[in-house]
Curated annotation (Swiss-Prot):
It is found in: Cytoplasm. One of its GO terms (cellular component) is proteasome core complex, beta-subunit complex. InterPro entries: Ntn_hydrolases_N, Pept_T1A_Psome_bsu_arc, Pept_T1A_subB, Proteasome_bsu_CS, Proteasome_sua/b, Proteasome_suB-type. PROSITE patterns: PROTEASOME_BETA_1, PROTEASOME_BETA_2. Component of the proteasome core, a large protease complex with broad specificity involved in protein degradation. Its EC number is 3.4.25.1. This is Proteasome subunit beta 2. Signal peptide: none annotated. GO terms for molecular function: threonine-type endopeptidase activity. The formation of the proteasomal ATPase PAN-20S proteasome complex, via the docking of the C-termini of PAN into the intersubunit pockets in the alpha-rings, triggers opening of the gate for substrate entry. Interconversion between the open-gate and close-gate conformations leads to a dynamic regulation of the 20S proteasome proteolysis activity. GO terms for biological process: proteasomal protein catabolic process. Keywords: Autocatalytic cleavage, Cytoplasm, Hydrolase, Protease, Proteasome, Threonine protease, Zymogen. The 20S proteasome core is composed of 14 alpha and 14 beta subunits that assemble into four stacked heptameric rings, resulting in a barrel-shaped structure. The two inner rings, each composed of seven catalytic beta subunits, are sandwiched by two outer rings, each composed of seven alpha subunits. The catalytic chamber with the active sites is on the inside of the barrel. Has a gated structure, the ends of the cylinder being occluded by the N-termini of the alpha-subunits. Is capped at one or both ends by the proteasome regulatory ATPase, PAN. It comes from Pyrobaculum neutrophilum (strain DSM 2338 / JCM 9278 / NBRC 100436 / V24Sta).
């Protein structure tokens, strides 16, 4: 994706040995103008699945709603929760179907199923890549350098939470369109839960 189409904000995902952590900062910007410092960019789909996104807020919300509705519909019909890969594939089809007028959002799909924890990275056209960690948005280069240096496959969820916060905070400190605190979602054997981390950046 060219720099002129680079989606704003910063989102990070980490696959731990016992779950997945997704985190995103809360600033909503229009160019270099801050519209809000309370934008929600992480969404719980069900107690086994969540997404984080970087891009246009309206498109993030639309994709989250599509995923929630389809996950619930599948669960009611089949009497079990869909797998993480199945929901990522569904989202991929939705995004690719709009390739001529795409959603301006990159997405991290994270969750836990019978196969264990999964983290799947998606671009605005729906390409799928499963990975151990990823960073999206304008602060991605800043965040991923810290992830590269500190990630371990045997990390616990608690360790992954700390690393995710550090990575997003690193982006907030240097990226002018990232900021406003951090929303964080953990998905593990105990379900999906959301936390808010307040960040004070001293410049």
């Amino acid at each position: 994706m060219g720099e002129e189409f680079q989606v704003g904000a910063t989102a990070v995902g980490i696959r731990a040995k016992d779950g997945v952590v997704l985190a995103a900062e809360k600033r909503v910007s229009y160019g270099f103008y801050t519209l809000s410092t309370a934008g929600k960019k992480v969404f719980i789909v069900n107690d086994k699945l969540a997404i984080a996104s970087a891009g246009i807020i309206a498109d993030m919300q639309a994709l989250a709603k599509i995923l929630k509705l389809n996950a619930r519909s599948y669960e009611l019909e089949v009497k079990k929760k869909p797998t993480v890969k199945a929901m990522a594939k569904l989202l991929s089809v939705v995004m690719f179907s709009r390739r001529f007028m795409p959603f301006y959002a990159e997405v991290l799909v994270g969750g836990v199923d019978e196969e264990g924890p999964h983290l799947i990275v998606m671009d605005p056209l729906g390409s799928l890549i499963e990975d151990n960690y990823a960073a999206l948005g304008t602060g991605a280069k800043l965040a991923v350098s810290l992830l590269d240096a500190s990630y371990r496959p045997d990390m616990t969820v608690e360790e992954a939470k700390k690393l995710a916060v550090q990575a997003v905070k690193a982006a907030i400190e240097r990226d002018p369109v990232s900021g406003g605190g951090i929303d964080l979602v953990v998905v593990d054997g105990g379900g999906a839960r959301e936390e808010e981390v307040k960040v004070q950046v001293v410049i």
